[in-house]
Amino acid sequence: MLASFLVIYCHYLMCDGFSHEFRMDVRMYEVAVMCIALFFAISGYLIHPSVERMTSLKDYYKKKIIRLAVPFTVCYLVMSAAMSTLYLFDEQMTEKVPLFHALFGAKYFNVLLGMFPVDLNIIKFLGLDISWFTGEWFMGIILCMFLLSPFLDKCAVKAPILSLAASIALSFFVYNALDGWEEQDLIQTRWSMCLVRIPEFLFGIILFIYREKLLKIRGKLIVGILIYLAAQLVYFVQTYPPQGAFFCPGNPYSFFLTLPVIYLIFTFVEWLNEFNFAAMNWFNGFSGISYMAMLSQHMIIYAFNNAVDFAGLTAFGKIYLLLVITWVIVVVSRKLQECSAPVENRFLKKREATVH
């Protein structure tokens, strides 16, 4: 939920009227990528128990694909229908709704492909020109991570430090090797490739597997990381605006900054859970809709951005609108979850019946 809210907050600040007024579009874009990196780490943290319970690799993949693809497709269809109606007479927003590709462009394959979480670089490579509609660029990456998770989990169990170092080296290699592809416009962005983002997912797996050992040295780790980050802050202030890739979460160099920050965030949440379990338990009650929130938030923010003059709002008005948008996202996500859950459970029951 924290990662979802931070992404919503960053995308809200990147809307027209904020980016020009406060010149924060680039900074917020980088913070949003950092939040999605946190989302990858959380996904890795939660995947280890599923891998441990795995009895069959085939069944594991089926279950994970259903858990990811069914909510994605339901959100795609419901939001596409709603947005198509909302933007029926708005030419500026038609290109953001996939259904218009079928209604006016006859690009039926684009619409069908958009119903499944596919890496946008694959879509770009195939030249399908589909809209960034549901879940943005990272849902296809999550699916790829799930497919790699049994292998990554074994690596994390047997050699955590070596496997993390190898994943970072692989990230650097792929990122640099695809430089020419990005210049030739063959891929969307190098940093959104699955192989480039593996370290964050693997780091989450390692945090779960070795959480008890890390708990024993938590104090020393926190002090060491804070000293390290303080040194980076001094460098950041002295060289502002930063020219290097170290402070850009889209570049593999940023792993040396984002991974320690992710550990601090995980530790902070653990401390909050120990400090006030009841409050955190209430907050975690929203976690069931966090996936739907990540899928629908960009479309809802688009709708408000298109309808409201953000630049003309007062400071109070902008804060109030953020609260309204967040509330709408929560309500819509709950409704989407209610639509998706029966379909998802039906597919899972069919799968279990087939297995037995």
Regions found by a protein language model. Name each.
Residues C194-F203, I209-G285, I289-M292, M299, ...:
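Alpha-helical transmembrane segments and terminal signal-anchor/GPI-anchor hydrophobic tails
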Residues L143-L170, I206-I225:
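Solvent-exposed interhelical
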Residues E338-H356:
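Membrane-proximal cytoplasmic C-terminal regulatory module of class A 7TM GPCRs
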Residues V33-A41, W137-M145, M193-G204, Y253-I262, ...:
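Hydrophobic core segments of transmembrane alpha-helices in multi-pass, intramembrane catalytic enzymes
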Residues I47-I65, M93-F100:
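Membrane-helix interface linkers and caps
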Residues M1-I47, I66-L88, G140-C144, L148, ...:
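Kinked, hydrophobic transmembrane alpha-helices enriched for aromatic residues
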